[in-house]
Amino acid sequence: MNQAGVVNAGYPGDTTRELLARFDRDVAPHSPDLVILWAGVNDMLYCGHTVPPEEFRRNFRRLVHRCRIPGSAVAAGTLPPRINAYFFEQFPGAALDPVPPDERVECANAILRELSTELDFPLIDFEGLVRSRPVAEDPASLLRNFSNSGMRDGLHLTPEGCRLAAELAFEVIRREHLPSSRIVCFGDSLTYGPWLKGRGTAAEDAEPYPARLAALLRKAAAR
């Protein structure tokens, strides 16, 4: 945990199954007062490893309860869209799936909204943030694409996207009066930040959203 009390506990490829399996190793030892959960993209889209929607619901509910056992507050992020053309390039077999990727992601977001109401935790609207810019092949997109990064990615955030995601998370923490002295950002590659400077960390000069959030918290504490 860094000076601002933020841990980047993201890991690429994880579904909610893996998050449950590594909770005691990667979250519990930090005794966080807040856990930010951002997961579900791999559950819905990682071909060969997808998790059925109702299992995703059960797993996410278990994650929330697991966070709360020692008294941690919980917030969760909605899932951003992805650039479908890139997705079908990476997973050609997905084009045969009768359920389009956008519908799978929206299914997960609907479950997250329902759980937010049922279990009373705030949502961070990362989906809305990404949709506020062009989603497809555009330099202004918050998703990494060939125009803005030279990579046909279409899922992970640009450095600018991470900065704005951190600002959004910070706003929710302040608005909801959430504790913020010890935060674990727990999720998959969207939290980890592949291809970014300081990936997998919340170091002072790193680019993933947990690092940007830590910087905002340090700035607020210094006022």
Description of each model-found segment:
Residues 187:
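Conserved S-adenosyl-L-methionine
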Residues 2-5, 14-183, 192, 203-223:
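Alpha-helical cap/lid subdomain in secreted, periplasmic
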Residues 197-201:
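Acidic/polar, solvent-exposed loop segments in beta-strand-rich repeat domains
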Residues 8:
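Conserved SAM-binding motif I beta-strand of class I
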Residues 11:
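Acidic/polar N-terminal loop/beta-strand segments that form early-domain functional surfaces
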